[in-house]
Amino acid sequence: MAELIEEVSTATHASLNACDPIVVNSEALPMQALYQLSATGAQQQNQQIPIGLSNSLLYQQLAAHQQIAAQQHQQQLAVSAAHQTQNNIMLATSAPSLINHMENSTDGKVKDDPNSDYDLQLSIQQQLAAAAQAAQMGQTQIGPQIVGQQGQPVVATTAGSTNGSAAVTQPDPSTSSGPDGPKRLHVSNIPFRFRDPDLKTMFEKFGVVSDVEIIFNERGSKGFGFVTMERPQDAERARQELHGSMIEGRKIEVNCATARVHSKKVKPTGGILDQMNPLMAQSALAAQAQMNRALLLRSPLVAQSLLGRGAALIPGMQQPAFQLQAALAGNPLAQLQGQPLLFNAAALQTNALQQSAFGMDPAAVQAALLANEQARFQLAAAAAQGRIPSSGNASAFGEQYLSNALATASLPSYQMNPALRTLNRFTPY
């Protein structure tokens, strides 16, 4: 304070001597130089514009007023925070009574809650902790949180600071779903003669049966099935009554069926593409028979022997020619196995006519029939001359060695048992 008075007196003395030029020259110059030095240092340090002594007094007064206003504002904030905390505590205290009042007004009865005191104390402690944390973080609290009886927080939001009414939101109990009872039953160890109507009759006395399914395989019933009932209560009663009962000497087991598990096995598509289709199997057998017949007819000796014995060649013409070509192309040994033994031109011409007959050409069919008749007469005449092979009778060469094997070779070389099993397969469905 003394330093401030000295500065004021010095400034007054300097202002009084400012009118005298002599005094200005003698006394004001050292003061002005000192002031300039101090102003230059202040400018270098704070980078601010220098001010006079009179302005510094005003600046100090303004700073003091600002500090006082800031302190008053902080006090007001502290008072408002205390009022807010008190209101929150009062609201938390009155919330359980408000809830009980609402329940009493709805039911018309007074419900005593033994855990209300403990919940109230716990909610007050939580509110105090939340208020302290909000005061530290500098955030205003929107509304209190009330902990319910089940340990789930129930948010209470204030509609406004004037009315003070609170709207309490509680979780909806209808959203919680409980497990339903069993409806589908698994029945095992049933008699093998049982069918769906028998199993349905056994369960109809307990309630309405919506579906019955007994599992079968190729040999018949597998001895178990599934029963689906309309109501879970009926299914449970049927399970309790029938489980362990004896039917035709077999102990019936009834249990709750688990969820169906669909296998990832790829099922073949039905129709022509199915290899187990009877029509497809018959077509494959016909193609195999035609290929075997064509391989046999490539040899002139075998062809003439078959014609002499009256082997039918016309049924082989009923299959289209492209099937024969596809079958021959699929067999790489067909050309090696079917190399004809060229003994004369007549046999080669007969073979060519027979091959052209497979194409369903009418002219080729007539030529094949004519060649068949001619060859039959020739073989009948040659048989009367004797069976000693010679160079002049090349058509009968080797016939005495092949007479026993030609009858078997004329038949198609495929097995009939797989075809019969395919056609006569038992399907219980």
Curated annotation (Swiss-Prot):
Record GO terms (molecular function): mRNA binding; poly(A) binding; poly(G) binding; poly(U) RNA binding; pre-mRNA intronic binding
Keywords: Differentiation, Nucleus, RNA-binding, Sexual differentiation, Transcription, Transcription regulation
Top-level taxon of the source organism: Eukaryota
GO cellular component: cytoplasm; nucleus
UniProt entry tagged with the keyword NADP: no
Protein location: Nucleus
SUPFAM superfamilies reported in the protein's UniProt record: RNA-binding domain, RBD
Start-end of Low complexity biased regions: 156-180
Protein name according to UniProt: Sex determination protein fox-1
Organism: Caenorhabditis elegans
Taxonomic path: Eukaryota, Metazoa, Ecdysozoa, Nematoda, Chromadorea
Gene: fox-1
